[in-house]
A protein has these predicted regions:
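Residue-level signal for alpha-helical context at structural boundaries
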Residues: 29, 64-65, 249, 253, ...
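Membrane-embedded alpha-helical bundles of polytopic integral membrane proteins
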Residues: 1-220
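Acidic (Asp/Glu-rich) catalytic motifs at the cytosolic membrane interface
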Residues: 39-50, 151-165, 188, 223-263
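A short, terminal or domain-edge coil/loop segment
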Residues: 88-89, 115-123, 225-231, 261-269
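Hydrophobic transmembrane alpha-helices of multi-pass small-molecule transporters
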Residues: 70, 194-195, 257-260, 264-265, ...
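Juxtamembrane boundary at the C-terminal end of a transmembrane helix
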Residues: 270-278
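Hydrophobic alpha-helical membrane context
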Residues: 21, 57, 167, 241-244, ...
Length: 278
C-alpha cells in the first residue's frame, strides 16, 4: 500500500527527531559522525544548487575544507588536540585557487565565489557546534539539544499560529517577495513558542543560565531561525529550485532542515560568549 505524503512526512520527521536527539546527547564520537554527515550533505546540496556539474573538483575541495575544519574543531574540543592542527583545513582551501589555474575555460569564473560562500554559510556555523558541547572535561549535549528544541518549537508555533490567523486575506505577510506564505502572525507565534520553550528548558535545568538570559536567548534563536529560513529561501529563489535536495523524504533536502539553525545557533553562541556564559 502506497503511503500518503502526510504519513511519509510524519514518519520521516519522527525518525529524524530520534536520530538528532540520540546523536547529540549520547556520545561525542556519534555526534561528530552525525554532524559531519549533515555538513557534507548540506554543503554538497548548496554547491549542486549553485554550480550544478560545473567546477566539480573545486566543489570537492570546498567540501573537504568544510569537513576538515569541523573534524579538527571537534578533535580540539573533545580530545584535546592542539588548535594549530586547524591549519590542515587550509590545504584544500588553498588548493581551490591553485586548481583554477588549470581550468580549460574561464567562462563563469565568478561563480567560483559560491565555493567560499558555502563554507561561510554552512561549514562555519556547523564547525562552531562542538564548542557548545563540553562542560569542563565532560561531554554534555543537552545545551545544543535545547537550542534545537527551541528552533523546532518556533517552527511549530509559526506553523500553527500562521495557519490559524496568517492566511486571511487582510493578514500582513512577513516577506512576500521571498516567501509569500509567511506572515507576521506566524513570526510572532514562532517567537512566543520559542521563548516559552526557553523558559521551560530553564526550569528543566537544560539551559543553565539566569532566566532573563534564557528569555533573551529565546528571542535571539526565534528571530535568528526566521532569518535563516528566509535566507535559504532567497538562495532557492535565486537558483530557481523548490527544495535544496530530496534526501529526507517529505521534507526536502538536508539544507532545508537546518536552514534556521545555521543562523540561530551561531547568534546564540555569540550572545553567550559576549556575556561570558560559555
Amino acid at each position: 500500500m502506497k503511503l500518503s505524503n502526510f504519513w511519509i512526512r510524519t514518519l520521516t520527521g519522527i525518525l529524524f527527531l530520534v536520530i538528532m536527539v540520540f546523536g547529540i546527547i549520547w556520545d561525542r564520537a556519534i555526534f561528530t559522525c552525525l554532524f559531519g554527515i549533515i555538513l557534507t550533505v548540506a554543503l554538497g546540496e548548496f554547491y549542486k544548487m549553485a554550480l550544478g556539474t560545473r567546477f566539480r573538483f573545486q566543489q570537492r575541495l570546498g567540501v573537504m575544507t568544510g569537513i576538515a575544519a569541523f573534524l579538527l574543531v571537534a578533535a580540539y574540543c573533545f580530545f584535546g588536540w592542539d588548535l594549530r592542527w586547524l591549519v590542515i583545513a587550509l590545504i584544500p582551501l588553498l588548493l581551490i585557487p591553485v586548481s583554477c589555474l588549470f581550468l580549460p575555460s574561464r567562462e563563469g569564473f565568478g561563480d567560483l565565489a559560491y565555493i567560499y560562500a558555502g563554507l561561510l554559510y554552512i561549514a562555519l556555523p556547523i564547525s562552531l557546534s562542538p564548542l557548545l558541547m563540553m562542560d569542563g572535561d565532560v561531554y554534555d549535549g543537552w545545551f545544543l539539544l535545547s537550542l534545537f528544541i527551541m528552533i523546532w518549537c518556533s517552527d511549530v508555533g509559526a506553523y500553527c499560529i500562521g495557519t490559524a490567523f496568517g492566511q486571511k486575506p487582510n493578514s500582513r505577510k512577513l516577506a512576500p517577495s521571498i516567501s509569500p506564505k509567511k506572515s507576521w502572525w506566524g513570526f510572532w507565534g514562532g517567537l512566543f513558542f520559542c521563548v516559552g520553550a526557553a523558559i521551560g528548558l530553564h526550569y528543566l535545568t537544560w539551559l543553565p543560565f539566569p532566566l532573563l538570559h534564557c528569555i533573551v536567548l529565546g528571542l535571539i534563536v526565534g528571530a535568528g531561525g526566521v532569518c535563516g529560513d528566509l535566507f535559504e529561501s532567497i538562495w532557492k529563489r535565486h537558483f530557481g529550485v523548490k527544495d535544496s535536495g530530496n534526501c529526507i523524504p517529505g521534507h526536502g533536502g538536508m539544507l532545508d532542515r537546518f536552514d534556521s539553525s545555521l543562523v540561530a545557533i551561531p547568534l546564540a553562541f555569540v550572545y553567550l560568549a559576549l556575556i561570558d556564559l560559555i
